[in-house]
Amino acid sequence: MSVEQNIINKICFFYDEIYLLHKPIDWHTERPERLISILTALEERVDLKDNINFLKPDKANEEDLLSVHSESHVKNIMTKKSGYLDPDTYISEHSLEAALFAAGALKRAVDEVKERKLKYVFCAVRPPGHHATKDRAMGFCLFNNAAIGARYAQ
């Protein structure tokens, strides 16, 4: 089996430690421990170790965000330092950086799949990104990573 075929058949797991720095101001359901539990479970699964390829995400840029979000929403998130954006969604010191790498993971996953380098992809990102709308953060999500990835794939 060639190296290329070997990579394609692995589960490619996009992850970066920056995701753990997106921390709530107080106790919150969406917290680093959610991702830590996934990583711990993967470490314990000896049968999976040879089938997972850990990859680092790229960082999304403002143009990527603007492909699905309004300028006012992007600027609001980029200038907010700390606090709650709604009852469910918080932002803290490293949240913006984590969110940019979360969106970037989706872009890189799209590239890898389109170029037929990867077949199976899992983006273990924080903050999550599928509830945010064009104009606002919500449901724990600052940006809509799923929409950014889909738009990028077009």
Language-model regions, residue ranges each:
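HDAC/HDAC-like amidohydrolase catalytic core signature
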Residues: M1-Q154
